[in-house]
UniProtKB/Swiss-Prot annotation:
Family: Belongs to the ATPase alpha/beta chains family.
Name of the protein this chain belongs to: ATP synthase subunit beta
Quaternary assembly: F-type ATPases have 2 components, CF(1) - the catalytic core - and CF(0) - the membrane proton channel. CF(1) has five subunits: alpha(3), beta(3), gamma(1), delta(1), epsilon(1). CF(0) has three main subunits: a(1), b(2) and c(9-12). The alpha and beta chains form an alternating ring which encloses part of the gamma chain. CF(1) is attached to CF(0) by a central stalk formed by the gamma and epsilon chains, while a peripheral stalk is formed by the delta and b chains.
Gene3D superfamilies in UniProt: 2.40.10.170, Bovine Mitochondrial F1-atpase, Atp Synthase Beta Chain, Chain D, domain 3, P-loop containing nucleotide triphosphate hydrolases
Gene that produces this protein: atpD
Protein species of origin: Campylobacter concisus (strain 13826)
High-level lineage: Bacteria, Pseudomonadati, Campylobacterota, Epsilonproteobacteria, Campylobacterales
Signal peptide positions (record): none
Catalytic activity: ATP + H2O + 4 H(+)(in) = ADP + phosphate + 5 H(+)(out)
């Protein structure tokens, strides 16, 4: 099972074997020294070149590797720790702890390359995954075991929404979450860890990081590492798990780098020829089974804001819902800055939600759309030139806009107001009341940063006083 390194080209390493040929995706271990420090490097077999030579992708920096070093085939793919012991810890792509905490003996390891659940084991029920976030549950609800795309520029609140979802899943559904940091900034990973620690959600989440400074192999496979941990919670413990991927674009980007290094002919815009099949293979593993579910929230970076770029376009094909964050909403001080007209969900269907929820959601969107259409007139002529009916629409739209804001548990530190979880029934009842004109007499300010409608009424009383 021992071989010898015959060529090193950055993250691509060729290994020669005598009487053994490792399978594709098998892990190979190399020990070497750099300036007196010992290093262990894991390689993953990507191609067979003939004559018992394999081409592999390095899962860590390959500086210091030399030809002639001994490499040992491990006889199996990369396997990572799974089970409740992984909660509250940070792992790298090969399942090593990187949080400088105390070591643990993990009793269970699973391979990161797994088949999706067989067709007959998958669940076909369409159920809503209640998040407790008003704007999401009302207008673009998440499917249990579905995939959600989270779109937004820098600094509009993607990470805060992710943390709030982790919090709500932990405290309301007593479920676990897995966070895979795929090719993002190390600083963000560090901040997320400390923010989670401060907001007491760390012991309900496993973190897997393969950051921007790492070679493409690590950035690509880290998504599989996180998914494997989530699959264990679903299949062996029967839980509904939340899986966060930040950022799914980097998964495709690192795949393109690996493909070029392996000498494959690129396809459109320089991406790998296997872009769609790699993405499909990954996304098919994220699903509901009869035992449990994995609901995934995937942050999507859109290169140069071009939605037709092959990487984001391939992701769209798999999404059940999109949550779009808008800077202009954040600038108004309305958080979460979710765009109620741009966010979509296949769950927004009377067959799934029931007539009442569907009617209220569509009513809210209609009022907000009308307000958007009237904004030019208001800017030029002012409110006084509008008809009485339009004035009422604008008044209700502004209340709805403010009522879509909500204080978050994980943001209590900055906002000073206690977080609120709003159940679906309270959520629908509140917006239904606004649409029916029950609260036309209340001031706009009463609806800002409150949970359910009772809190808005209480706030209105306070404002009167």
């Amino acid at each position: 099972m021992k071989g010898v390194i015959s060529q090193v080209m950055g993250p691509v390493v060729d290994v020669d074997f005598n009487d053994y040929l490792p399978k594709i995706n098998e892990a190979i271990e190399v020990f070497f020294e750099v300036e007196g420090k010992k290093h262990k490097l894991i390689l993953e077999v990507a191609a067979h070149l003939g004559d018992n030579r394999v081409r592999t992708i390095a899962m860590d920096m390959s500086e210091g590797l030399t030809r002639g070093l001994e490499a040992k085939a491990l006889g199996a793919p990369i396997s990572v720790p799974v089970g409740e012991k992984v909660l509250g810890r940070i792992f790298n792509v090969v399942g090593d702890l990187i949080d400088e905490g105390e070591g643990i003996n993990f009793d269970k390891h699973w391979s990161i390359h797994r088949d999706p659940p067989p067709f007959e084991e998958q669940s076909t029920k369409s159920e809503i995954f209640e998040t407790g976030i008003k704007v999401v549950d009302l207008l673009a609800p998440y499917a249990k075991g579905g995939k959600v795309g989270l779109f937004g520029g820098a600094g509009v609140g993607k990470t805060v929404i992710i943390m709030e979802l982790i919090h709500n899943v932990a405290f309301k559904h007593s479920g676990y979450s897995v966070f895979a940091g795929v090719g993002e900034r190390t600083r963000e990973g560090n901040d997320l860890y400390h923010e989670m620690k401060e907001s007491n959600v760390l012991d309900k989440v496993a973190l897997c990081y393969g950051q921007m400074n790492e070679p493409p192999g690590a950035r690509n496979r880290i998504a599989l590492t996180g998914l494997t941990m989530a699959e264990y919670f679903r299949d062996e413990m029967g839980l509904d798990v939340l899986m966060f991927i930040d950022n799914i674009f980097r998964f495709s980007q690192s795949g393109a780098e690996m493909s070029a290094l392996l000498g494959r002919i690129p396809s459109a815009v320089g991406y790998q020829p296997t872009l769609a099949s790699e993405m499909g293979k990954f996304q098919e593993r994220i699903t509901s089974t009869k035992k449990g579910s994995i609901t995934s929230v995937q942050a999507v970076y859109v290169p140069a804001d071009d939605l037709t770029d092959p990487a984001p376009a391939t992701v769209f094909a798999h999404l059940d819902a999109t949550t779009v964050l808008n800077r202009s909403i954040a600038e108004k001080g309305i958080y979460p800055a979710v765009d109620p007209l741009d966010s979509t969900s296949r769950m927004l269907d009377p067959q799934i939600l029931g007539a009442d929820h569907y009617k209220v959601a569509r009513g809210v969107q209609a009022v907000l759309q009308k307000y958007k259409d009237l904004q030019d007139i208001i800017a030029i002529l002012g409110m006084d030139e509008l008809s009485e009916e339009d004035k009422l629409t604008v008044d209700r739209a502004r209340k709805i806009e403010r009522f879509l804001s909500q204080p978050f548990f994980v943001a209590e530190v900055f906002t000073g107001s206690p977080g609120k979880y709003v159940s679906l029934d309270e959520n629908i009842a509140g917006f239904k009341g606004i649409l029916e004109g029950k609260y036309d007499h209340l001031p706009e300010a009463a609806f800002y940063m409150v949970g359910n409608i009772d809190e808005a009424l209480a706030k209105a009383e306070k404002l009167k006083a």
